[in-house]
Amino acid sequence: MASSLPLLPKPISPFFKTPPFSTSKPLVFLNFQTRLTSRSSDVSVNLKKKNNPWLDPFDSGEDPDNEYGSLFADGKQDEDPRPPDNPDNPYGFLKFPKGYTVELASLPLKIRGDVRRCCCVISGGVYENLLFFPTIQLIKDRYPGVQVDILTTERGKQTYELNKNVRWANVYDPDDHWPEPAEYTDMIGLLKGRYYDMVLSTKLAGLGHAAFLFMTTARDRVSYIYPNVNSAGAGLMLSETFTAENTNLSELGYSMYTQMEDWLGRPFRSVPRTPLLPLRVSISRKVKEVVAAKYRNAGAVTGKFIVIHGIESDSKASMQSKGDADSLLSLEKWAKIIKGVRGFKPVFVIPHEKERENVEDFVGDDTSIVFITTPGQLAALINDSAGVIATNTAAIQLANARDKPCIGLFSSEEKGKLFVPYAEEKSNCVIIASKTGKLADIDIGTVKNAMQVFEGSLALV
């Protein structure tokens, strides 16, 4: 009997009755949201409030029945206490880091969501950074005592000499798809060492930019994301996302940051919704003095000249918007427009010295020309002027920020409503649009008739 038994070892039964992966059968993924819909109605309401679908699918949001104590639960955060000044010390007082008393700082940061340091990564040039000013003011109003830092392009950094709410502005191009490895890692280390509580980004994030924000180790990582497949995986590394309406956020005009502003100003417990203030800029005394010397050398007098901005040029200092490519007008058109100026001296702003000879050829040798490349000097020039005639450049926004009469020239009515939505509410702002959709075809006669808006400035002089 024993000799008839087989000598082969007994086969071991497999752990899985069916193979864990088979190419003959399609993969099946669990849809967590369909499973969660069978729960109670109050949970489904909380799920609808959840904006980021990439986060924990089992997280139903904040518990409405949770009771907080009186400590750090309601109201806005308080500004950090300032030590008394030492009159014998030329440096004032020793500034300790904000997280020095860690046992007190961590509690309000966790319970109330305080933001002591905020970094804003801004995509674009002067125009895009200028339109972000109301958002910065909203952050300062919502989080008293917060320190706001900016990360933007070289051209965009120049804008923040007009903003006193910004502590530091660093140069880093977020739109560069292939940054230098040394620059990339150095910037990550710089941001990580500042211990930000919140990082905001206006660049449309994919997985790469989301990873950059994630490595800053900020508590709240908030960013716009692509409206297409390029956003895949970005939400895993971000705590809050805003899906852009298109791939070019600048095409939305003045309200390009509406989604982020609504989220920042949202009501929270006993704190009501924080209102969004209009665009305002502040100009330093030194910049005013430098600009005053420039336009006086050009033959202009304070309050008796009109700023002409938006001549056709290939210079980056034209301060155009990325959402409006057709926003510069040829010198032939400008020469015809200024013939309708009465009682004021037109002052042409050139973004490069090579344009000076072209302006003199088309307009005349006795033309007042000022060479300006920074938004701070442009704002100072507009502040001392009687008004502005400009295409869709930063000059239009600066004129309205300083409450100066302006005439805006746009390629279409749609562009005018997008970039200057407040024109109908203001009596000293006139928008003139081309009927053909091209800025070059704008009606010169209509522009000349609109110059009546400067008559009030002439009466004040």
UniProtKB/Swiss-Prot annotation:
Region annotation Disordered: where it falls in the sequence: 66-90
A GO term from the CC aspect: chloroplast
Organism: Arabidopsis thaliana (Mouse-ear cress)
Record function comment: NDH shuttles electrons from NAD(P)H:plastoquinone, via FMN and iron-sulfur (Fe-S) centers, to quinones in the photosynthetic chain and possibly in a chloroplast respiratory chain. The immediate electron acceptor for the enzyme in this species is believed to be plastoquinone. Couples the redox reaction to proton translocation, and thus conserves the redox energy in a proton gradient.
Key word Cell membrane present: no
Gene3D superfamilies: Glycogen Phosphorylase B
Protein name according to UniProt: Photosynthetic NDH subunit of subcomplex B 1, chloroplastic
Alphabetical list of PANTHER family matching this protein: PHOTOSYNTHETIC NDH SUBUNIT OF SUBCOMPLEX B 1, CHLOROPLASTIC
Keyword list, A-Z: Chloroplast, Membrane, Plastid, Thylakoid, Transit peptide, Transport
Organelle targeting peptide span: 1-44
Phenotype upon loss of function: Malfunction of the NDH complex.
Membrane topology reported for the UniProt record: Peripheral membrane protein
Record note on quaternary structure: Part of the chloroplast NDH complex, composed of a mixture of chloroplast and nucleus encoded subunits. Component of the NDH subcomplex B, at least composed of PnsB1, PnsB2, PnsB3, PnsB4 and PnsB5.
Bias type Basic and acidic residues, positions: 75-85
Cross-referenced InterPro entries: PNSB1 (IPR044983)
GN (gene name): PNSB1
Top-rank taxon, per record: Eukaryota
Localization per record: Plastid, Chloroplast thylakoid membrane
